UniProtKB/Swiss-Prot annotation:
Disulfide bonds: none
GO BP term, pick one: protein transport
Membrane spanning stretches: 37-57, 65-85, 100-122, 146-166
Gene: scamp5
Domain of life assignment: Eukaryota
Protein name in the entry: Secretory carrier-associated membrane protein 5
Amino acid sequence: MAENNFPPLPRFIPLKPCFYQDFNEIPDQHRTMCKRLYYLWILNSATLAVNLIGCLAWMCGGGGATNFGMAILWLILFTPCSYVCWFRPIYKAFKSDSSFNFMAFFFVFMAQVVISIIQTVGIPGWGVCGWLATITFFSTNIGSAVVMLIPTIMFTAVAVLSFIALTKVHNFYRGSGGSMSKAQEEWTSGAWKNPHVQQAAQQAAMGAAQGAMQGQQYSAAPTYNYDDPM
């Protein structure tokens, strides 16, 4: 079994990586989408970090410490939770063509989209520099509001990209014949947690794709029949 390599922690930290991540084990036809979702997770995490700075400016401008404290919780909790709860399921889904993991991704990522929209709105007291909080604070402190505007724009980008990603993955899943009943069958049989079954499904999918490509390659080649003269 491969050694865990994510997150890549410095050697002086007395902790070891918790997950194994290698995009080369994702089938070619899914690798680009999987990487884009990973970059979306990075953008979401970076947005939460920038939001912490925005809430610090908010507090320094007279906005109170509640938002800054909530921003710390957003960053500490949602950065690892979003990776574990929606990126890992879609990573496994693309890797082994698992309907159960696709359903887990859809369930959590829909909540992620809703949260991103709430963050974009920016309700005061929630620890996020959204549009409502930023625009109203311009009348109090323009300098702080300008700093708050940066995470506001980033939250908007995350919300839009998350909705687009959810739509694309859903269209792909339904187009490939996936359904809730298939996910229930995997849950009942326990195939979703069996690495041997997952590996076999992955190999079968890759073999089918290679066979289709070879069939297209040789379908145009002429065939000759020879009669035995003996």
